[in-house]
Structures are given as structure tokens and as C-alpha cells.
């Protein structure tokens, strides 16, 4: 005979499944239309695996330029990250985004990035395919990276011919790992003794980054409900590679010669504002902009209260619109 506790559990209503999208149950096409954009989804084949990709095009008006966006660690392009894509598209830009290898609906071991040059090259293959296509080849083109996607974006820039891109945009990029987020050298050394066998192990300490990234509690709930979000421990090879590649980009900031915009919040608990400050100080670009937002957390657009996110978006819009006017298209 079932106990009282078991009977209560059996009679309790089932937890409803999460909505199919961050905005709820409104059909996708209807929602995107309400935001003034047209969305399409597809897969892009590369030698390193298949990438899930999305485009966000303005419903009306002439396209000013193209923006190629990369998301952060454990995230993907199909949840709240779309808010960034849709914002730029509503300003008149054709936006293209891809789930990084090992993320979302792209191929690869979940959140394993033992070779970030390969991760960057794979997304770059898709971005350059679009960038060089007839509708877009003569338009201004910008790379955009958020958080760890900023690191991947900078690696893509280093892998590209100088004239490929009009400008770079970063939101809380990961170029410097905060001391309290750095992996233990003892752990990395111990796992290194296994000759690479431990590289894909999800065995590194987890600092629960999402709670340090999102200020707005309601948005935190929405982001935490993302079915594609990686929630396991960091993988050994990923953390080792992040240490290597953050050091690499710090040593090569001077190779950045095109216009750059970078932004950080002073209360960022995931990446530190030093990342943006160092890029701004060391980049060789004659045209560079640094924005530091007092009291804002890591996720400047997806996770801040709306009034804060609007401040950031306004600054980004003014910057990119000004660059398009200043540098124009290749045929201008």
C-alpha cells in the first residue's frame, strides 16, 4: 500500500514543460515578424563538423551592412542570444550567427574546445561564405563576439585577411581570466600526466557562472531554462586551451588595426573589465571605443534590466551606424 508521501507525490500535478522559445509559445514566424526581422535556420557543412546557423534579416528597408555574431561559453544562438541578433537586424543589418563547435545544435563534444583555433576557423568558414556571397560582398562587415565568443571572434580576425572586416565589436569579451575563475595549475598538471586521455573529461571545478552573469532575476530564470545550455563541469582541455589562448591574444592585441568597439560592466563576475581595457590600450587601431558601464554585470544585453540593456544597445547602434557612414561599402 503506498505511503501518504507517495500518494501525495503521485497526485501532484506534473511540472509543465518549458516553452519552446524564450518568448513563450507564440509561433516563431509571428514573433520574428513582430520584431521586424525575418529568421532562417540551416546547417553548414565544414571539414570539422556541421554548424547550426541562423540569419536575421530586416523585414523592410535597405541593408546597411552585415554582422557576424558569436555567443559565449555553454550558450547557443537559439535562446536569449537572439535578442542581440534581432536588435542589430531591426537597425537595418543582416545578422548571421552560428552555434560554436561543441555548442547548441552544432557538432562536437558538448562544451569541449581543446583547439580554439579550429573552433574559430569553423565558424569563420561559414561567416566568410556569407560575407563573400553576391548579396553581401560589397557591404560593410563586422565581427561581433560576446564573452568567450569575443575570444573566438578575435581569433577569427587574426585568421582573416586584413581587408575582410570593417570593424570588431565585443560585449564583455573573455581576454583575461579573473583570478578566481582560473583553473588550478595543479589540476591541469595532474590531468596532463594522462597524455591527453583526460582532455575531454568534465572534471574541472565549476564556478556556477550563470548566477554571476545575469542581474535581472526574471531574465536569469529564462536563461536557465534554455534546453541547449551546457550545465556540466568545465572540461579539462577547454580550460587548458582558454588559459593558452587568452595569453596568446593578450600578446597580439597590437595586431588589431581596424575599428573596434568593446564594452564591459564594472560588476562583471565572469570576465573582468581588464579584458576590454587592455584591448583598447594595446590595439593599433586609430579608431577605437571603450565603454565601461558602472554596476552592470557580465551579460550586458541579455541579462541586465531593460533600461540598462537599452543604454548598451544605443551605444552599439551609434557606433556601428557611424562606422558604416564613415567607411561605407566597397563600391562607394
From Swiss-Prot:
Low complexity biased stretches: 1-13
Gene Ontology BP, a term: response to zinc ion
GO molecular function, one term: caffeoyl-CoA: alcohol caffeoyl transferase activity
Active site residues per record: 147, 268, 298
Membrane topology: Peripheral membrane protein
Region annotation (Disordered) ranges: 1-26
Subcellular location: Cell membrane
Entry-linked Pfam families: Hydrolase_4
Record text on subunit structure and interactions: Interacts with ACBP2.
Protein name: Caffeoylshikimate esterase
Gene that produces this protein: CSE
Amino acid at each position: 500500500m503506498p505511503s501518504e508521501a507517495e500518494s501525495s507525490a503521485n497526485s501532484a500535478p506534473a511540472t509543465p514543460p518549458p516553452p519552446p522559445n524564450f518568448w513563450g509559445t507564440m509561433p516563431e514566424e509571428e514573433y520574428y515578424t513582430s520584431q521586424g526581422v525575418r529568421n532562417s535556420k540551416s546547417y553548414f557543412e565544414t571539414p570539422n563538423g556541421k554548424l547550426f546557423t541562423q540569419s536575421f534579416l530586416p523585414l523592410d528597408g535597405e541593408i546597411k551592412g552585415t554582422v557576424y555574431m558569436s555567443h559565449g561559453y555553454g550558450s547557443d544562438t537559439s535562446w536569449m542570444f537572439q535578442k542581440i541578433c534581432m536588435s542589430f537586424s531591426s537597425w537595418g543589418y543582416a545578422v548571421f550567427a552560428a552555434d560554436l563547435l561543441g555548442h547548441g545544435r552544432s557538432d562536437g563534444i558538448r562544451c569541449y574546445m581543446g583547439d580554439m583555433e579550429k573552433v574559430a576557423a569553423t565558424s569563420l568558414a561559414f561567416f566568410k561564405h556569407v560575407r563573400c556571397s553576391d548579396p553581401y560582398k560589397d557591404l560593410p562587415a563586422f565581427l561581433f563576439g560576446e564573452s568567450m565568443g569575443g575570444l573566438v571572434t578575435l581569433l577569427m580576425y587574426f585568421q582573416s585577411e586584413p581587408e575582410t572586416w570593417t570593424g570588431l565589436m565585443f560585449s564583455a569579451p573573455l581576454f583575461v581570466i579573473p583570478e578566481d575563475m582560473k583553473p588550478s595549475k595543479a589540476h591541469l598538471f595532474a590531468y596532463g600526466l594522462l597524455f591527453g586521455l583526460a582532455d575531454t573529461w568534465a572534471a574541472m571545478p565549476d564556478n556556477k557562472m550563470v548566477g554571476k552573469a545575469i542581474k535581472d532575476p526574471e531574465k536569469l530564470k529564462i536563461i536557465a531554462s534554455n534546453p541547449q545550455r551546457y550545465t556540466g563541469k568545465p572540461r579539462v582541455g577547454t580550460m587548458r586551451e582558454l588559459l593558452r589562448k587568452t595569453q596568446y591574444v593578450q600578446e597580439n592585441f597590437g595586431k588589431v588595426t581596424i575599428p573596434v568597439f568593446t564594452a564591459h560592466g564594472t560588476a562583471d563576475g565572469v570576465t573582468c573589465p581588464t579584458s576590454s581595457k587592455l584591448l583598447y590600450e594595446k590595439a593599433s587601431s586609430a579608431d577605437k571605443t571603450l565603454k565601461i558601464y558602472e554596476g552592470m554585470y557580465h551579460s550586458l544585453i541579455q541579462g541586465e534590466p531593460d533600461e540598462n540593456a537599452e543604454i548598451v544597445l544605443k551605444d552599439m547602434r551609434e557606433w556601428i551606424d557611424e562606422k558604416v557612414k564613415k567607411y561605407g561599402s566597397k563600391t562607394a
